[in-house]
Amino acid sequence: MGSAAVLVANRGEIAVRVLRAAQEAGLRTVAVYADGDDAHVGLADEAVPLAGGYLDAGALIEAALRTGCGCLHPGYGFLSEDADFAGRCAEAGVRFVGPSAKTLRLLGDKVRARELAARAGVPVLDGASGLAEARALLAGGPLMVKAVGGGGGRGMRVVRSAGELAEAWERCRSEARQAFARDEVYAERLLEGARHIEVQIVGDTTGAVTHLWDRDCSAQRRHQKLIEIAPAPELPDSLREKVLDSALRLARAAGVTSLTTVEFLLHGGEFRFIEANPRLQVEHTVTEEVTGVDLVAVQLRLAAGDTLADVGLAGPPPAPRGVAVQARVNAEVTAGDGSVLPQSGRITRFDVPTGPGIRVDTALRAGREVGTRYDALLAKVIAHAPHGGVEAACARARRALAEFAVDGVRTGIPLLREVLDRPRFWAHTGVVAEHVRATEPGAPTWQDGSVTAPMSGTVVSVDVALGEPVRAGQQVLVIEAMKMEHVVRAPASGVVRRLHARVGGTVTAGALLAELDEVAGADPSEPEDARADLDAVRADLAETERRHGFTLDANRPEAVAKRHALGRRTARENIDDLCDKDSFTEFGALAIAAQRRRAGPWTS
C-alpha cells in the first residue's frame, strides 16, 4: 500500500473500527481529531489535531503527507463521498480508500446516479433537479427533497404542499452545506408505505463486481435509520434476485472498485432505485456478521491493488449464516410529534452488553462529554443469531439493549427495545413513526408567550425582529444540532416582545429564545400555512387533472390507432379543427354511463 501507514480521516466509532482493522493488517495508524473530540485517538499510533475540523480537505492531506501515510481512509460521512477530495488525494500521492474520483462523481451525486441507473435499465422514481421542476412534480403528489451528496438523513424533507416547498428546499441546502460541504438538492416522488432495502456491492480495478447480499433498513424515524437487518427478512427469492441483479448492473455501469451500497424502495412486488452510497455504511456490521467478511479489511486490500480473487470473493457470494440485527444507540429522545431531541452531557456510566452473538462498536467510555456538534450516535449494538431467524436475532438484540447502561445523557434505548418487540417492524418505513405517535406524549404546549428551544444546539438564523408580528407556525429561528437543522416556529400568533437568541450562540434544551405578546383578536391556533397560497395546486385538483389526462388522445395511442386504421378521426381531432384554440369548454369528461341495474354496484 505504498507507505505502510493509513490516516483515518474520521471520528467516533467508525474511526475506532478502521483503526483496529488497519492495525490487524499490520499498518501503522494515524488518527486526526478536532478540539474536544479525541475519544478515538487512543487506539492510533499517532494523532494529529485539526484546527478546521473533519471537512478541512487540505489539512487532512497535509497531515497524511507529514506523517508518512500512503493511504487515507475517509470512514463515512464528512468527505467520504467527495470526488474532489479523492482527486486531491491522488494528486498528492495519497491513496484514497474507496472508489475512484470518477465513480464518486457518478454515485456521490444522487442526480447523476439516478440518470445512470435509468440508462442501466434499473427502475427509478420520478424526479426533479430544480425548484421549478419540483413545483410541477408536486402537482402529482408529495415529494422528498434530498441533498445531492451525503446521506444519514441529513438534507432531507418531505413536502406535501406548495407552501412548504421553498422552505424545505432551503433547509435541505443549508443542512447539506454544513454536513457535506455542498448544497445542491433535488426532489423525487415520495413513495409511502414502502420498505427500504439495500445491497452491499464489492468491486475491484479489473472490473469484477460481486454482492454480499442485502439488508433491510426500514426501521427509521425522520429518514434516519435506527435498526438494520441482514439479510432482509420476508423477501421472496424471485424479488431478491431482481434487486441483486439491478444493483450489480448499476455497479458495473459505474465502474465500482471498492465498497458501494445500492439502495431501493420496495412496494408490493415492485422496487425503485433511490441512491447509491460509494463508501462504507454505518450498517456494514450486520453484513460482516452473516457473511464472515471483514469489509474494512477488504477495503484496505482493494485500495492496495488486490482483486476480488485475492480477497476470496471471486466465486459465488458466501451464503448468509443466520440473521444479524444492528440497533443504533443515539443520545436523543423522540417526542410524540416525531421530532428528535438531541441530548448532551457528561457520561457518568457506560456499561456495554456482552455475551455470545453480541458486538458493540463504540469509541465512548464513562467520563466523556457528549455534545451536539456531531452525530448523536453513541454506539452500535449488533446481535447475531446463527439459528432461529429474525425473531431470534431481535430477541438477542432486545436483551443486549436491556443490559446496556448509560447514565449522564438520555438515549434512544427504550424506543429501540419497543420497536424490536413489535411484530414485523420492518413492514415499511413509517412503522417507527406510527409507534411513536401511539406511545409518546405530544409536543409541549405554549405558555406565557414563551418560545423555547426544543433541544440543545447552535442558533444558525434568527428570522424575526423586535416588534414584528408573527403568526402561528411562522419560522422564528433555526437551531443546528447533530448536523441537522431544526426550525423553531411560533406556537401562536403575536408580536415579538423580546429576543434572547443570537446567531452563532449555543442554547440548551428548554432555553427561552423569544417572548411574544398575544395579538388581541388573533386566532392563536391558525398557522401561517392557513393563509391561501394563490399559486398552490390543491391535491384534489391535481388528481382530477391527472385523471382528465387519461381521456386525451395523447394518452390513448391504441384507441387512436384503431380509429385511424378504420380511416376515421377521433372526436378530439374534429374539435381541434372546428374550434379556435382554447375556445372549446368541456364538461363531464370523466362521467360514465349509469349501468348500476345491469352491471351491479362497484366493489372497488
Please report, for each region that a protein language model flagged, where it lies by residue:
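N-terminal beta-alpha lobe that positions the nucleotide/phosphoryl donor
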Residues: 1-262, 266-281, 569-571, 586, ...
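Short, well-ordered beta-strand elements within core beta-sheets of diverse protein domains
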Residues: 156-158, 189, 235, 377-387, ...
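Catalytic cores of soluble metabolic enzymes centered on carboxylation/carboxyl-transfer
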Residues: 247, 285-450, 456, 475, ...
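Generic structural motif
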Residues: 345, 451-459, 490-498
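Short histidine-centered loop motifs in beta-beta connectors
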Residues: 454, 461-469, 498-502
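Short hydrophobic beta/alpha edge segments that flank linear recognition/processing sites
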Residues: 468-488, 508-524
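Short, compositionally biased
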Residues: 489-497, 520-536
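Terminal-region recognition feature
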Residues: 528-604
